[in-house]
Regions:
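Short glycine/serine/threonine-rich phosphate/pyrophosphate-binding segments
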Residues: 100-102, 166, 189-194, 216-227, ...
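Rossmann-like adenosine-cofactor binding region
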Residues: 262-330, 335-337
Length: 383
């Protein structure tokens, strides 16, 4: 039953009133633009942390007093953690080549996302942030820039950098610096979706070693999630990954159509579409673009399916589209305005908090696995 009126339309489905998506999106758009435009512009700012109201305090903060910590650090670089904000300062850095589900929109256009990460790091983990947009698509220039400014920071959060360049960028920056470096699109997504998978599989009575997982998308987050799922117990042979051309098969690998990062996920099957892959699938992991999945495709999945439609800002399929065809599905999205949010904010603030607190030089696979299991356990705690 559908009831329509201006300026909104309402769909009544399964006893719930669901706002028309066009109306919902137009409302959110206006509210979001007003939110960002309100004074002061943007979402983050720098504030002093020491007294500075007298001439004497200013002489300690700057000349002549500032010379003394400079000399101490010159003699013993590790004292930067003692006399500066380095130990609680993270750089959120992007070149804007893979922003949310918006694609390559450029470095400057990525700034609202980086400011948003800064707000979340400060709010949830009390970590200070400089957001930095590097205006280059050249991996060598990007790596050099980040490595040159790395001494300022206690950690580096790489963000919204397209694949496959992101893999080499993260690896080389991590090797060249002595502070924790994490590409959140890869590892943050893997950690939080891995935790969700553990709990969803338990709720649906499925063993990880037996489930068929279909991944829509073959970029940074998709490849990292698939690798992490294997570490959790999913069989590599049970993962079917689809890129923009369809199922990643050994035929396509033989034709030179898959790069070195996609190659391990080439399956020995006929070429096909995402719809073909989803037949009898237990899990759908969407890390691609909005509107990619239909109710008809979901209807052909296995009993008690698990659907993680994590494309942002628009999921691959809306929750009400799933419930219209399945009463036995677990559905999650990356959005905070729908139930069952699976979003990186559940992970990256606390991962960096822990890494900074122990002065970790790297964010290791063991740390990622521990975070995954801790999140899964936390979700079971009473609210």
């Amino acid at each position: 039953l559908t009831q329509r009126s201006n300026p909104r339309s309402v769909r009544i489905c399964f006893g719930e009133i669901i706002m028309d998506e066009d109306w919902r999106e137009s409302t959110i758009k206006k509210e979001a633009l007003d939110y960002h435009e309100a004074e002061p512009k943007g979402k983050i700012k720098v504030v002093p942390t020491k007294p500075h109201s007298t001439a004497h305090e200013l002489s300690l903060a700057y000349s002549p007093g500032v010379a003394y910590p400079c000399l101490e650090i010159a003699e013993k670089p590790d004292d930067a953690y003692r006399y500066t904000s380095k130990g609680n300062l993270v750089a959120v850095i992007s070149n804007g080549t893979a922003v949310l589900g918006l694609g390559n929109i450029g470095a400057l256009a990525s700034k609202p996302v980086m400011e948003g990460k800064g707000l979340l790091l400060k709010t949830f983990a009390d970590i200070d942030v400089f957001d930095i947009q590097v205006d280059t698509e050249d991996p060598e220039e990007f790596i050099k820039t980040v490595c040159n400014i790395a001494p300022t920071f206690g950690g580096i959060n790489l963000e919204d950098i397209k694949a496959p360049e992101c893999f080499e960028i993260e690896r080389r920056i991590a090797e060249a610096t002595d502070i924790p470096v994490m590409h959140d699109d890869q590892h943050g997504t893997a950690i939080i979706s891995g935790a969700a998978l553990l709990n969803a599989a338990e709720l649906q009575g499925k063993e990880l070693s037996n489930i068929k997982v279909v991944v829509a998308g073959a970029g940074a987050s998709a490849i990292a999630c698939a690798n992490h799922y294997v570490s959790l117990g999913v069989k590599m042979s049970n993962i079917v990954m689809c890129d923009s051309k369809g199922i990643m098969t050994k035929n396509r690998l033989d034709d030179g159509d898959l790069n070195e990062f996609k190659a391990p996920f080439a399956v020995d099957s006929e070429d096909g579409s995402l719809a073909d892959a989803l037949v009898a699938a237990d899990v759908f992991l969407g890390l691609s673009r909005g509107g990619l999945v239909t109710g008809e495709m979901v209807a052909k999945m296995a009993d008690k399916p698990i659907i993680f439609a994590l494309a942002n800002p628009t999921p691959e399929i809306m929750p009400h589209e799933v419930t219209a065809v399945r009463s036995d599905a677990i559905i999650a999205t990356g959005r905070s305005d729908y139930p069952n949010q699976v979003n990186n904010v559940l992970g990256f603030p606390y991962i960096f908090r822990g890494a900074l607190d122990v002065r970790a030089r790297d964010i290791t696979q063991g740390m990622k696995m521990a975070a995954t299991k801790a999140l899964a356990a936390l979700a079971k705690e009473p609210v």
